[in-house]
Amino acid sequence: MENRKEVGILGANILYLITAILLLTIGYYVQHKDVESGLIITEYILILLPPLIYVRLKGDNFKRVFRLNKLKLKHGLLIIGITILSYPIALFFNLVIMTFISTLGNIEPPPIPTAKNISEYFVLMIIISMSAGICEEFFFRGLILRSYERMGQINAIVISSFLFGLFHFNIQNFLGPVILGLIFGYLVYRTDSLFAGIIGHMTNNGVAVTLGFLINLINRKLPKQDISTNMPNTLQLIMATVFVGFIATITGVGAYLLLRIIIKDTKKRRYMEVENIEKIKKMSLFVFTPILLTGIIFIYVVYLQLNSIMH
């Protein structure tokens, strides 16, 4: 029987829907006025604060829900390596979607700020790498993952990853976050520490910020060979997808080998009892209504994005 003081699936789903609406309304507004301060408000007030308030009101244990357990230095370093090696994998899946979309029209570059100088670089590392890494992990690998674990660990990891991808509300950046969510979710379970997800998330976003900064530097040195002003066409995207896919295959093997070290170091974690999972199967579909509504919103946003590309 579910403990009323413990976070549950329905509560997490409702909070997910509310946060998604806040992201698309208040988040969009504050980021439109000023990207950097808007991102800070979005991450700390719209994404981090709601789950903290929910757990507090629910009366659950913060350390239990968010897995605020120590992470070995060795595992932290391995996670950094795993994330860097997994970056091409996430990029590959995003490129696959971008390639298909490019057949509809000219795709637009993602609305992510890039650093043009070293001071902007450090500011974006704090905002995009550190802040997003902390706040989003508390929400997804913290609250969402813990709430869904009554359905079994595999289901919890998969569902939280899907919701993580959905939460970006960008068809071009959907599969990448899903893949990363699977990796971060598994690492959090193996280590029983949210810090595993935070380190991984911060590393991934840090790589993205660094690559954007380097591209701007290259453009400045080689103004006649601009490599970022225009988005590539379908043929170029196909070539890029094949190339990145080849790189991802190699780095993926490396990431797996590093992951094996963590698996050997951590105790084998048990899955939920079969009878408990069976009870969840009888759960009312009403519990997942907030997710369905969020999915409808996502589809509408994607429709607007595709319509903009085709026109």
Model-derived features: where do they sit?
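Juxtamembrane helix-loop-helix connectors linking adjacent transmembrane helices
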Residues: 30-31, 35-38, 63-133, 303-311
